[in-house]
Amino acid sequence: MANTRTQRRENELPYIPFGPFQIRLPFIHYKIESVEFIQGLILGVTALAAVPYLEQYLGLPYELAWSCVIIETFLYLLHSLLGDPVVPGWITPTLPLTIVFLEGFPMGEERIQAMIALQMLVGLVFIFMGVTRLADKFVHAVPNSVKGGILLAAPVTVMAGQLGENGNMHKYPLAIVAGVGLLILISFSDKYQEKRKTNKFLDLVARYGNLFPYLIAMVVGLLVGELDAPGLEIGTFIKIPQFKDIIDQVSIFGVGIPPASMFIKALPLALVCYVIAFGDFVTTETLVSEARQARDDEYIDFNSSRSNLVSGLRNLILSIIAPFPPLSGPLWVGMTVSVSMRYKEGKKAMKSLLGGMASFRLATFLSVLIIPVVSFFRPIFGVGSSITLMFQAFVCARIGMDYCKSDRDKMIAGVMAAVLATQGTAWASAWALA
């Protein structure tokens, strides 16, 4: 790996240099941002929307699946700890492909081994791209038309899933529309941004980003009967993960190392997952660049090689301990946008971008441990996941179109997006090169 910069730039958040990483600790290198922390305590439980995938496709009981998600959520903290200025998430658009892959194996240890093989390969691809620094070259060398096509494929994939036969839009249409509509309004409406300057309530709603859209979706869902009434489990306060059961029933130590044939079968999908996740690096680069332009009091260092390494570590650790079908991605687009928009409001709103993102994910980890919070918000897991996905679709569509400057870019990106969303990377690459 090339020599890593160790000199801190002017106005850059303090850190401890550690190879390619920049170690930062809460309360020492950055302050906890209260707004993001409160959002994380409430919105963080949406991480448990992954529980149904672990139950349905890996055959895990609810309590064990919850324990696996706690470990996955803890690993979110690696990004802020190691100097990656993002709110990390899943590689969500690959989930339908992962499910199809898993269904090719019988339920039980064999299917869990298949998930281990896939996630381990995904982690190794991320790490390879980070160690060789090919990620930096890849991000800057890929033509704008291809970047646009990759990003525009996300809304096609997301909306196809949400509007499909088993999509959540058929289960919770009014709740989702209410939540997504409000989130888009407070994020992109020029009129709303003008009115919030003179209206304290509108300003409060906007400052808390995703919080009010989720709460509105919950209220609407309850009123129209799309959601069950929330319960409040009183008694034990903190969920202790079932570490022994995880090691015995889910980890590579319990189910065994996957055979070579599984790795061979998983390799094409692992490469597809990376190509799709690549769009998150493009999105992050754009969002960080916009944040830099909005403020000159802090230098924000986004390095795609570092981001690859951290994402790779998360996937590699999970593949060994608690394989995770949504996979570990470099970005939760919706929340990263929400935090960066508040950051742009100035130092009084948020001192540090990384501090805001770290505060959210620290609270996320705490929220999935607090049993009363999890039990209360459990009915909205599916709706919250859909709001996040659909907002991501809007953001990716905006940024993808921004990359298309010429008519040729627009033609290539449009066709590539459609082919990538429906047929995969091989066909999409052929169209891009044609």
Q: Residue ranges of each PLM-predicted region?
A:
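Helix-loop-helix junctions within the multi-pass membrane cores of secondary transporters/permeases
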Residues: 17-32, 39-51, 79-151, 297-393
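Membrane-interfacial loop-to-helix junctions in multi-pass transporters
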Residues: 62-70, 146-148, 260-264, 299-309, ...
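Hydrophobic alpha-helical segments of integral membrane proteins
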Residues: 134-142, 159, 163-166, 236-260, ...
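Helix-loop-helix hairpins and the membrane-proximal interhelical loops
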Residues: 1-62, 198-302
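Helix-coil boundary and interhelical linker segments in multi-pass alpha-helical membrane proteins
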Residues: 52-66, 101-114, 164-167, 263
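Generic transmembrane alpha-helix motif of multi-pass integral membrane proteins
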Residues: 52-56, 76, 80, 414-422
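Loop-to-helix transition at the N-terminal end of transmembrane alpha-helices
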Residues: 58-81
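Membrane-embedded alpha-helical modules
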Residues: 111-227, 355-434
